[in-house]
């Protein structure tokens, strides 16, 4: 996980602007969630289920990090779904993820 993205996620966590799992979905339904991170090692069927639910709520989703990496940020074992509930932080995280994807494509 890239350090800058981890720092932004930590900032959202310290500010209390995050939710996990079903709570993230509840926040999405209430219009609070601005971005959802789904761990890349989540099973394909669960990824599809989460993406469908968040897409229905009009919340962008990114596949990023592993369950353990996301869990580490919250001092938990593993986290599959994390919502960022602050627009500016979500925008910056999304921008950095896109840059990381572009850099990965250029290296291949």
Language model features with spans:
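Glycine-rich nucleotide phosphate-binding loop and flanking beta-alpha elements
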Residues: 26, 43-44, 88-90
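N-terminal first-folded block
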Residues: 4-38
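N-terminal positively charged helical leader segments and presequences
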Residues: 30-52, 59-60
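Short, ordered loop/turn segments at secondary-structure junctions
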Residues: 41-42, 66-69, 87
């Amino acid at each position: 996980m890239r350090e800058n993205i981890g720092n932004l996620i930590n900032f959202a966590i310290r500010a209390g602007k995050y939710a996990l799992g079903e709570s993230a979905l509840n926040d999405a339904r209430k219009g609070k969630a601005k971005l959802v991170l789904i761990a890349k090692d989540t099973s394909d069927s669960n990824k599809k289920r989460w993406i469908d639910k968040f897409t229905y709520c009009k919340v962008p989703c990114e596949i990023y990090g592993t369950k353990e990496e996301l869990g580490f940020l919250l001092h938990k074992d593993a986290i599959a779904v994390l919502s960022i509930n602050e627009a500016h932080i979500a925008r910056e995280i999304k921008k950095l993820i896109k840059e990381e994807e572009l850099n990965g494509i250029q290296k291949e």
